[in-house]
Structures are given as structure tokens and as C-alpha cells.
């Protein structure tokens, strides 16, 4: 009765972490510090509080799949400021659609990419992966081809080695920049290469840019796929870009973002929403518009994460003297000798819950690209981050990394 294709989704990182730790009691003398999940803790910007009352009546209206005018204008202004020149290549009536966060959209885009003309189709996925990409690949009916994102290639999946036969069978390719969880960036040339492949071999290039506005303030803002398209003076054919407010504006519960891309894909996605997926409520669209209009709160958020990474580097300077602070994102990607053992020890002895890298990626040719790393979410207030880093530092003083 049930679709067995989805059995593989039961094996996901948080379920695996629960299986690893739930039967092990934490240290009863220490409060639990949950550093395993990337849920922003800074809190929503205060200026949106009143807007929940301002748009109260709109909860009584069915939302359209289309963006309301104020949101469309806000996104247009945001994109043109963030990616100068973008208005030259975007038709905001045909290339843009609001989505209730990007997790659903990343999943459903796989269904849209299903291509019966491509026999034995392939979905190319970055490894480590976000579970919505994997769900989308399953929806596409394709065989998954994993591309490892490793330190040796600056966590940029190697698309150069994809064969002509593989590319001809590809229905969708998922890439994520800045990378998750390592916070690495890419360059214009990489984007241009990926864009050209998508257009030449006619597949959907899905670019997850949910961390595009979480960056270290001492560096330039990360480049995005739009920067490459602008430089190429190319249209959005074969491209879909995913943008979310969850990380940018500390509102993961708002479920607001947008997809920008190929007008044929957007048109089909709109049809899918009209027939059974989720449109974005009108009050949420109004609040999202206010957030996209404001840059100050986003910059303050980036400063907040800058401080947390400085704290981590200071506490870990003895155990990890060459610790690299990521260019973007809010995860510390910490190398260790045995990530599963360290995860258990930190929980059992120090009541700190972290995510072992092993659970975040698939084994490819007998190798897991994330084995030997911990993902530590530096999303909490600095007092909590200090306490967590102190405990982790104490652990490393008494144990081999």
C-alpha cells in the first residue's frame, strides 16, 4: 500500500542522532546545551511584532500562488541591491514565486524535474546533503549520483568529472552555496560552469542559497548564482534559485522565502501550488516584504555570529590551533579523530549535544566525506556559546582529538 521509495528517508541525521544518544543519560550535574540543530536563537526582529496585528484581517482570505505587490516590489529591490544588475535578466511576473520556506520547494522541484524522455534519469546531489534534496531526487524518479564536497576541493562538488553520458541523463542537479554545513564559498567561474552544463544538457540546476546572507562581516558578501548570470548576460532558463528568510532574518517559524528561475518551471510550480501545495498566507507575505526591505537586522545578525566564532576560536586554540572559521553560515565544522565517539562522550560527560558528520552524508565508494567532523551550531547567545565551548575545550584537554 505504501510507497517504498520513501523508506530511505527514515534514515536521516536527527533520527540517527536520537538512536545514538537517547539511551545514554547526559551528565546529571550539567544543564543540557543543544548545539546539534541550526535553529537561530537571536529572535525575530522586533519591528515586525506590530505587523501581526496590522494584517490580522488578511488571515480571513485565501492566498494566491502569486506574490502580493508589496512582496514582489520588496524582493525586486532586495535582489537588485544584493545582486546589482539583476533586474536586467529577471521578469518578476514570470520568474518569481513566494514559497512557505524553501524546504517544501526544494522537495517539490524534484517532482517538476521528472523527465520521462530521459531514460534511466539521474539526480546529481551534493554530499553532505539536506534531506529535502534527497526527497526531491526521489520525487524525480531518478537514480541519485552523489558528488562529495570535501576539503580538498574547498567543499565545491567536482562537476568537471561528470561524463557526457551522465549529463545527458541528468534531470536535476542540487548545489548549495554557501555550502552547508561547512560554510564555504565558490566563485563566478564555478557557477558559470554549472549554468552552462544545465543549459547544454537541459536539466534543472537547483541552487540552494539559504545561507547567502549569513557571512563574516570582515569579508565581502558571498556571490550567488545571479552574479554569474548577470556577468554572462544570460536568462534564467534551466535555473531555479532558492532564498529563505529563516536564517537571514531569524524567523524559521515564519516559513517565508521565494524561488526565482526558469519561467516554465515557475509556471508549473504555480500550477502545482494551485492544485495541492502550499501558498504563502497574505499576512506572512506582508511581513516577509518588511524583512526583505531591511538590511540592518541582517547585518546585526552577521555580527552576532562573528562574535560566536571568535569565542569558539579562543576556547579551541589549544586543541585546534589551525581552526578555520568559515566564510559563511553559522556552523563550526570541527575536525576530530572519531566523530561518533566524541559525540557520545560530549553528551555523556558534558551534556553537550552535537551532530556527528557521519550522519550528514552518504557513503560513496566506501567513504563518507563527513566522517571525522562535528557540526556545532553557534546559534545561541554568547553566554551559552561560551559555556558550550568551555565544556568542549575541557573535553579535548583530557582526550585525544
Regions found by a protein language model. Name each.
Residues 60-197, 212-214, 218-233, 385:
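Conserved core of the PLP fold type I
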Residues 140, 200-201, 319, 350, ...:
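Helix C-cap/helix->beta junction micro-motif
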Amino acid at each position: 500500500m505504501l510507497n517504498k521509495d520513501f523508506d530511505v528517508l527514515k534514515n536521516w541525521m536527527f533520527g540517527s542522532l536520537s538512536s545514538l544518544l537517547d539511551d545514554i543519560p547526559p551528565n546529571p550535574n550539567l544543564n543540557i546545551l543543544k548545539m546539534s540543530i541550526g535553529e537561530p536563537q537571536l529572535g525575530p526582529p522586533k519591528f515586525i511584532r506590530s505587523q501581526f496585528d496590522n494584517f490580522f484581517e488578511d488571515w480571513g482570505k485565501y492566498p494566491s500562488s502569486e506574490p502580493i505587490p508589496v512582496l514582489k516590489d520588496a524582493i525586486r529591490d532586495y535582489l537588485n541591491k544584493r545582486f546589482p544588475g539583476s533586474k536586467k535578466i529577471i521578469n518578476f511576473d514570470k520568474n518569481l514565486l513566494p514559497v512557505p520556506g524553501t524546504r517544501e520547494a526544494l522537495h517539490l522541484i524534484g517532482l517538476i524535474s521528472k523527465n520521462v524522455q530521459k531514460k534511466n534519469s539521474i539526480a546529481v546531489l551534493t554530499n553532505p546533503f539536506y534531506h529535502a534534496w534527497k526527497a526531491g531526487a526521489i520525487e524525480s524518479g531518478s537514480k541519485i549520483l552523489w558528488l562529495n564536497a570535501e576539503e580538498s576541493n574547498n567543499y565545491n562538488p567536482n562537476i568537471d568529472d561528470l561524463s557526457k553520458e551522465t549529463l545527458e541523463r541528468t534531470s536535476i542537479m542540487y548545489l548549495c552555496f554557501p555550502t552547508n554545513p561547512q560554510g564555504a564559498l565558490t566563485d563566478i567561474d564555478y557557477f558559470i560552469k554549472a549554468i552552462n552544463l544545465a543549459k547544454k544538457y537541459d536539466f534543472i540546476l537547483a541552487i540552494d542559497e539559504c545561507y547567502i546572507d549569513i557571512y563574516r562581516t570582515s569579508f565581502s558578501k558571498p556571490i550567488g548564482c545571479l552574479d554569474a548570470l548577470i556577468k554572462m548576460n544570460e536568462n534564467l532558463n534551466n535555473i531555479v534559485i532558492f532564498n529563505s528568510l529563516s536564517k537571514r532574518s531569524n524567523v524559521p517559524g515564519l516559513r517565508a522565502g521565494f524561488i526565482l528561475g526558469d519561467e516554465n518551471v515557475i509556471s508549473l510550480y504555480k500550477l502545482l501550488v494551485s492544485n495541492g501545495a502550499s501558498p504563502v498566507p497574505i499576512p506572512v507575505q506582508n511581513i516577509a516584504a518588511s524583512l526583505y526591505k531591511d538590511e540592518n537586522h541582517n547585518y546585526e545578525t552577521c555580527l552576532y555570529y562573528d562574535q560566536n566564532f571568535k569565542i569558539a576560536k579562543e576556547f579551541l586554540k589549544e586543541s585546534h590551533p589551525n581552526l578555520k572559521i568559515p566564510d559563511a553560515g553559522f556552523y563550526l565544522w570541527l575536525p576530530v579523530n572519531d566523530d561518533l565517539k566524541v559525540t557520545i562522550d560530549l553528551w555523556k560527560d558534558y551534556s553537550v549535544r552535537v551532530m556527528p558528520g557521519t550522519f550528514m552524508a552518504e557513503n560513496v565508494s566506501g567513504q563518507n566525506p563527513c566522517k571525522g567532523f562535528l557540526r556545532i551550531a553557534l546559534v545561541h547567545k554568547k553566554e551559552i556559546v561560551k559555556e558550550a565551548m568551555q565544556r568542549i575545550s575541557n573535553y579535548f584537554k583530557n582526550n585525544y582529538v
